[in-house]
């Protein structure tokens, strides 16, 4: 039997390409499981196999705990230390017992456990093997095609899955076809697929360029950003770290060979290679290619840009179903609003008119000064109150005295507006206090009612149960009781 164990370990290790230690551990687990089935009680068993001789020893063990809940598997610390041995909590006390005989049932049980443990070891090794390739392109052969996914054979008993959303539109494969995709998921689950590949992710595009353009791998050219509408169109932004090299030209290749190779792999996906620029406005202008941008207005606070194009360029700038502007927005990270130059002029004229009326209403200053401020792009009191004073002095045709007056006026108005806001809050708090006179009412519930514009007992009395059921932690019965209490106070009592 000892020689047979060593032979099994050697055979399985060679067949499955697994370490011998993993097979020994699987055998020990199998023998322990078979031994447990020989006993009526639920006991804990450990089996130790001699790695050289193949002989094995069986131990029954108990865990050392403070309070015993499973007498057949646990022992108290006091009992464990009875013989004077040094034992600590969560240690094990072991006792050698007779090893199991290999009858038919024992052999079948051991076989099942070994198969399971070997499979787990294979899956763990597969995860470890492919984890380092996450984010890289790997190649597989179509093994099986299902309705929602494709199973790929990666070789060496490794399989990967491409989900339907990971494929490109109108892409059809047959068993035996060779497919390339980006490995994006390596999962150690005990069941189901462990490796997931995609052809629709943006990383697929960037990795293909990394393969086709040696300068990217050498870090002479850097991919800064990319955006895709898989199978249709993409934009990729590149930057050179060597001023002697044109990054766009290098990615396009001689007669477009490099970009064409990438496009062919992605079912003819149209790819715009654009030059990266650290200036967001200039980068957006580059990203809007092939459309020509007439002017651009940046709103850093809202993280938006208004892009004006000639009316003849509008359709091209927006793209089919908004594709061009959508990809430009994704690759730049800015919200882009495309319009004609006439529309942009009208919009700014309207905004200037609104800002002029706002400042005229809230600032006690000359209209000519307001026109100067609006022309410089100011539209809020906060800007005037908190902009560095030296920047305010740089405004053309604005004297230092006028700048001081503008700043003081803006701060005073903001303080007044804050005071009015506080008064309103105080008034709301007063009405909330009135609601607190009702039995069963608390401050949190009164605040929730105030958020629904219910400030007084009379307003609460006019409500129906359905009006209050969306309030958190308030059920229909409680809502009805509150409403009836309010009605009793308002309608049937002369005082609270």
Curated annotation (Swiss-Prot):
GO terms for cellular component: cytosol. Pfam families: HHH_5, KH_5, NusA_N. Sequence repeats lie at residues 364-414, 440-490. Gene3D superfamilies: 3.30.300.20, 5' to 3' exonuclease, C-terminal subdomain, Nucleic acid-binding proteins, NusA, N-terminal domain. InterPro entries: DNA_repair_Rad51/TF_NusA_a-hlx (IPR010995), KH_dom-like_a/b (IPR015946), KH_dom_NusA-like (IPR025249), KH_sf_prok-type (IPR009019), NA-bd_OB-fold (IPR012340), NusA_bac (IPR030842), NusA_N_sf (IPR036555), S1_domain (IPR003029). Residues 135-200 form the S1 motif domain. Residues 302-370 form the KH domain. GO terms for biological process: DNA-templated transcription termination; transcription antitermination. PROSITE patterns: KH_TYPE_1 (PS50084), S1 (PS50126). One of its GO terms (molecular function) is RNA binding. The keyword Repeat applies. SMART domains: S1. Keywords: Cytoplasm, Repeat, RNA-binding, Transcription, Transcription antitermination, Transcription regulation, Transcription termination. Monomer. Binds directly to the core enzyme of the DNA-dependent RNA polymerase and to nascent RNA. PANTHER family: TRANSCRIPTION TERMINATION FACTOR NUSA, TRANSCRIPTION TERMINATION_ANTITERMINATION PROTEIN NUSA. This is Transcription termination/antitermination protein NusA. The gene is nusA.
